[in-house]
Design a protein with these regions (language model features):
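N-terminal glycine/serine-rich phosphate-binding loop of ATP-dependent small-molecule kinases
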Residues: 1-100, 128, 234-246, 431-435, ...
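Active-site core segments that coordinate phosphate-bearing ligands/cofactors
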Residues: 9-11, 25, 111, 117-183, ...
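Active-site donor-binding loop signature of nucleotide-sugar glycosyltransferases
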Residues: 35-37, 221, 297, 477
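Short beta-strand-loop/turn "lid" adjacent to the catalytic site in phosphate-handling enzymes
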Residues: 67-104, 133-139, 172-195, 220, ...
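Structured loop/turn residues at beta-strand edges in well-structured enzyme cores
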Residues: 71-74, 214, 406
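Carbohydrate-associated surface elements
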Residues: 107
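A structural motif corresponding to the C-terminal end of an alpha-helix
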Residues: 208-215
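Accessory "access/gating" subregions that flank catalytic or transport cores
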Residues: 218-221, 242-244
Length: 504
């Protein structure tokens, strides 16, 4: 039930850009601003961002969206945040200056640390406590790397001078002038340091990784007032005092924004990576199929969990065609090329540029194109790139249905690549279930806005969000089932060529 009229500013801090979207109380977009920023690749398999650029671009987007909206400060009820998860920032709590670049979720530099933790037998404990697997994807080993490799960092951390946060924590700390060092449960659950059943940091894991617990943010629910916008933020002077009151990691926010509020409902986000989540309700299911368990959100004392599988490179593989190979000028051209040929010509592309995520969890896999002949052309490669995204999502859904012990009847989709009707149709063909694309594709930002709106009185309960979702198009399977199976069988052969490629 709508309690009051009001507008919510959603900050959507992603892997390649910072965005700000203002929503009204009916879920309509009032204004939007976006600022892309530079990716940093210091070494093969390493990925970084400049934390100050993350902050500055996010504040610029927020300021521009507010200016475009034509609203007054009194119209804004609150601010919600959603963010790229796992990306790790360590900063000086007195100066606010980062001690090193943000180590991005895609970064593989800590694979040797993970290998050692696995060899030490820590895997079962990590899974029991955190719901995760030991992998360089998660924040814990990234923090350890910074403390071990930045001169003086460990000593400063032990003296209580340094703070850690994922991007949500970094933004909230800066928006509130350093008054709130917090992180919501959904983000905490992606660090490999968090006890997801007791909703607290795990002392044993922090000790094993050598991470002082004084660095860690206070774990908090996803919907509550964390603080207010501080004075003096450039371009945001008029928003001083507005409550910052909702936060969730991007995939958790998208699950809510897609109205997957009933156990068994699932969504997939097609962004830089692909992220498939299934609501498991109040039960934190431990996967036997290579998936992980995370907190989805916590509202009014009720915590909701999700099963999750992650594909590390999805939309980024289309960017690779554009930026590194020069085969396309825009993402839409990939669709046009893919549709210009009747099939993939036997070409399969495995986009394991930074390893393979769920369900294989192969940190040493690398990208591969197989099946090339003299007749292969750029259209076949473009088609293979899009099809490769769909195959990986199928692998996730197959694993998820084993863990959930029930079939998925429909998959809700969002994210930038979901605008590709070719990809959505091929996904339906591979999964053999309908694909439901919503009218509002900004589901991640809306999930964050909804959490903020719950805290500041725009909406009353999580059930209210169900009234706001509308479908744009339903894609139903069209391909012959036997043909679909043959395509996927060939894909499995291609993945086998890429696995363990860089392992010495």
């Amino acid at each position: 039930m709508l309690i009051m009229n009001g507008y919510i500013i959603a900050l959507d801090q992603g892997t390649t850009s910072s965005r700000s979207i203002i929503f009204d109380s009916k879920g309509n977009i009032v204004s939007l601003a976006q600022y892309p920023f530079t990716q940093i690749y210091p070494k093969p398999g390493w990925v970084e961002h400049d934390p100050m650029v993350i902050l500055e671009s996010q504040l610029l987007a927020m300021s521009e969206a507010f200016e475009k909206s034509g609203l007054s400060p009194t119209d804004i009820a609150g601010i919600g945040i959603t963010n790229q998860r796992e990306t790790t920032i360590v900063w000086d709590k007195n100066t606010g200056k980062p001690v090193y670049n943000a180590i991005v979720w895609q970064c593989r530099r800590t694979a040797p640390i993970c290998d050692q933790l696995t060899a030490d037998g820590l895997g079962p404990y990590v899974k029991e406590k955190t719901g995760l697997l030991i992998d360089a994807y998660f924040s814990g080993t990234k923090i350890k790397w910074i403390l071990d490799n930045v001169p003086g960092a460990r000593e400063r951390a032990e003296r209580g001078e340094l703070l850690f946060g994922n991007v949500d924590s970094w933004l909230i700390w800066n928006l509130t002038g350093g008054r709130a060092h917090v992180s919501d449960y959904s983000n905490c659950s992606r660090t490999m340091l968090f006890d997801i059943d007791n909703l607290c940091w795990d002392e044993e894991l922090c000790t094993r990784l050598g991470i002082p617990m004084s660095m860690l943010p206070v774990p908090v629910p996803s919907s509550m007032v964390y603080g207010q916008v501080t004075a003096g933020l450039p371009g945001l002077e008029s928003l001083e005092g507005i409550p910052v009151c909702g936060s969730a990691g991007d995939q958790a926010a998208a699950l809510l924004g897609q109205v997957c509020i009933v156990p068994g409902q699932a969504k997939n986000t097609y962004g830089t990576g692909c992220f498939t989540l299934m609501n498991t309700g109040s039960k934190s299911v431990r996967s036997v199929s290579g998936l992980v368990t995370s907190v989805a959100w916590s509202v009014n004392g009720k915590t909701t969990y999700a099963l999750e599988g992650s594909v590390f490179n999805a939309g980024s593989s289309i960017q690779w065609l554009r930026d590194e190979l020069g085969l396309i000028g825009t993402a839409h051209e990939c669709d046009i090329l893919a549709e210009s040929v009747s099939d993939n010509g036997g070409v399969y592309l495995v986009s394991a540029f930074t390893g393979l995520g769920a369900p294989r969890w192969d940190m040493y896999a690398r990208g591969a194109i197989v099946g090339l002949t003299r007749g292969s052309n750029k259209a076949h490669i473009a088609r293979a790139t899009l099809e490769g995204i769909a195959y990986q999502v199928k692998d996730l859904l197959d694993a998820m249905q084993v863990d959930a012990e029930s079939p998925i009847s429909v998959l809700r989709v969002d994210g930038g690549a979901s605008v590709s009707s070719f990809l959505m149709q091929f996904q339906a063909d591979m999964l053999r279930v309908p694909i439901d694309r919503p009218k509002l594709v900004e589901t991640t930002a809306f999930g964050a806005a909804f959490l903020a709106g719950l805290a500041c009185g725009v909406w009353e309960s999580v059930d209210d969000i169900a009234l706001l979702r509308q479908s744009d198009r339903i894609f139903k399977p069209e391909m012959d089932a036997e043909q679909a199976k043959q395509y996927h069988d060939n894909w499995l052969r291609a993945v086998g060529r890429a696995e363990k490629w860089s392992q010495e």
